[in-house]
């Protein structure tokens, strides 16, 4: 089916690429795609295009990669050029998903039907940069995707639609990301169909209660504090897969932990002490309970099940992982 509603799309990672693909496949014209500049990545630190750029180029969509959209920012000339490009590109609505750049009011005012954001949480919970990670880390039973009409605030716009998803007990950020990306893609296509048909999308202001912020994930958060309860550490490991991983330090070597589950405590061992090193998993004493680690990675190695890891990197009961410094 071919649609007439013209959509400018702004987004960067895989989460956004799923939405762009759905919009394109549904038949909406996309006269312009905005995405962040190519960044160095990988071991060779070669410039790599974003997932959104790769999709757009493969499907013949015009792409712009301004480093900023704020005239008063660090790149005023580039921002001015991008804003002029937006003004000169005929379109009706802008869809924004994990773009990573601030949109000033001047940009929000350009599309006739405004800017719609696809956000990976049930707003107003987990506004900000890392809503998927933080929902798992906090032990939330459910999360979802919210479509909102963007305003100048940080994820504060009126809500158009939402979809709720239960968080599975073994959910990682990687698996939850893919489920939420699919939901976001479905929601935005339905919303664009409605907007084209009705000329308006009803929206409800976000409630004042229940606001939380999902701070960007930092590499420093990877270190596991064994003084914490085992269930908290298990959530941390799941939340930080694929980035930055959970890290435990043994004799100066940083071992990444990729899969773990809380189990009952084994005796009175001090936090961080390995109490069992078996093919089924490495059990480590925690502040309360213990953590059975079933997937590990040594520096420079691959993720391995505990059985394979132990075959090449033996661990033994009584060894103790270092405790992180308490801030």
From Swiss-Prot:
Source organism superkingdom: Bacteria
Reactions the enzyme catalyzes: L-methionyl-tRNA(fMet) + (6R)-10-formyltetrahydrofolate = N-formyl-L-methionyl-tRNA(fMet) + (6S)-5,6,7,8-tetrahydrofolate + H(+)
Task of the protein: Attaches a formyl group to the free amino group of methionyl-tRNA(fMet). The formyl group appears to play a dual role in the initiator identity of N-formylmethionyl-tRNA by promoting its recognition by IF2 and preventing the misappropriation of this tRNA by the elongation apparatus.
Alphabetized UniProt keyword annotations: Protein biosynthesis, Transferase
UniProt enzyme class: transferase
EC number: 2.1.2.9
Binding residues for (6S)-5,6,7,8-tetrahydrofolate: 121-124
InterPro entries in UniProt: Fmt, Formyl_trans_C, Formyl_trans_C_sf, Formyl_transf_N, Formyl_transf_N_sf, Formyl_transferase-like_C_sf, GART_AS, Met-tRNA-FMT_C
Any one GO CC term of the record: cytosol
Family: Belongs to the Fmt family.
Lineage: Bacteria, Pseudomonadati, Pseudomonadota, Betaproteobacteria, Burkholderiales
The protein's name in its UniProt record: Methionyl-tRNA formyltransferase
Gene Ontology MF terms in the entry: methionyl-tRNA formyltransferase activity
